[in-house]
From Swiss-Prot:
Catalyzed reactions: (1S,2R)-1-C-(indol-3-yl)glycerol 3-phosphate + L-serine = D-glyceraldehyde 3-phosphate + L-tryptophan + H2O
Function: The alpha subunit is responsible for the aldol cleavage of indoleglycerol phosphate to indole and glyceraldehyde 3-phosphate.
Keyword annotations from UniProtKB, A to Z: Amino-acid biosynthesis, Aromatic amino acid biosynthesis, Lyase, Tryptophan biosynthesis
Cellular component terms (Gene Ontology): cytosol
EC number: 4.2.1.20
Name of this protein: Tryptophan synthase alpha chain
Cited SUPFAM superfamilies: Ribulose-phoshate binding barrel
Transmembrane segments: none
Taxonomic lineage of the native organism: Bacteria, Bacillati, Cyanobacteriota, Cyanophyceae, Synechococcales
Native source organism of the sequence: Prochlorococcus marinus (strain SARG / CCMP1375 / SS120)
Family matches, as PROSITE patterns: TRP_SYNTHASE_ALPHA
Matching Pfam families: Trp_syntA
Length: 267
């Protein structure tokens, strides 16, 4: 089977001796136009793949920082449709692959097939749906793949081994390894068992492994690279920088942080 755009991205960063840098931002925080500027800036400052969150009112997997960002985005009128429309306008300006991070409820409300069609037209490369159980991924995966979208599945430290094997073999693009038990958020240290989980996933499939939830600084990026991960996903720490930025300086602040993180990808 031909490799996907995401898999090619991981191959490229590996060739360069780097771990892929994968920042996450919440679309519409503070508004969709600023999100568009931030996406362009992140690509400019070294992002290999960007995760774009679609705001939802009940984000079970997310900690307080991302929950607040989702609230701000919803209050500014952001919807799945407005996110995809914004993404469409960037097709000629962005070449970095975009993964849409959405919960199953907004996806089902939109219509699974319609969402995949519109996401693909808007130029997205993949989807992450954190609350979709493995047993329900088959239909979405087949629709997504038919529209050239990878459906990325998540593995947590609490996932039983046999289930972990199934997830890693069914995940497309990469396997999303959740580094901690619980919700997204900044952590001061990463647990050593993340390394064991990376090794276990390596034994199950050749799909790249990206680590997220709790990666918040250059030290963590270096750590997961040494542990053998293919990608480092940085969410809450970046979302916090954006929310703390002076109005009009959000893209600038995001770019500075991305530059710092990028330097760590080859260490």
């Amino acid at each position: 089977m031909e490799s996907s755009i995401l898999e090619r991205c991981f191959s490229q960063s590996k060739k360069e001796g780097r771990i892929a840098l994968m920042p996450f931002i919440m679309a519409g925080d503070p508004d969709v136009n600023t999100s568009a500027e931030i996406l362009i800036m992140l690509e400019k400052k070294g992002a290999d793949i960007i995760e774009l969150g679609i705001p939802y009112s009940d984000p079970l997997a997310d900690g307080p920082i991302i929950q607040k960002a989702a609230s701000r985005a919803l209050n500014s009128g952001t919807s799945p449709k407005s996110v995809l429309e914004m993404l469409s306008t960037l097709k000629t300006k962005l070449s970095v692959p975009i993964i849409l991070f959405t919960y199953s409820n907004p996806l089902l409300n939109y219509g699974m097939e319609e969402f995949c069609i519109d996401a693909s037209k808007a130029g997205a490369a993949g989807l992450v749906v954190p609350d979709l159980p493995l047993e329900e991924t088959e239909k979405l995966s087949s629709i997504a793949l038919s529209k050239n979208l990878d459906l990325v599945l998540l593995v947590a430290p609490t996932t039983p081994k046999e289930r972990m094997r199934k997830i890693s073999q069914r995940s497309n693009g990469f396997t999303y390894l959740v580094s901690v038990t619980g919700v997204t958020g900044e952590r001061s240290a990463l647990e050593n068992r993340v390394q064991l989980l990376i090794n276990e996933l390596r034994g199950f499939s050749s799909t790249p492994v990206a680590v997220g939830f709790g990666i918040s600084d250059t030290k963590h990026v270096i750590q997961v690279k040494r542990w053998g991960a293919d990608g480092a996903i940085i969410g809450s720490a970046l979302v916090k920088r954006i929310s703390n930025a002076t109005t009009g300086q959000e893209a600038e602040e995001a770019g500075k942080f991305c530059s710092e993180l990028y330097k760590a990808t080859s260490l």
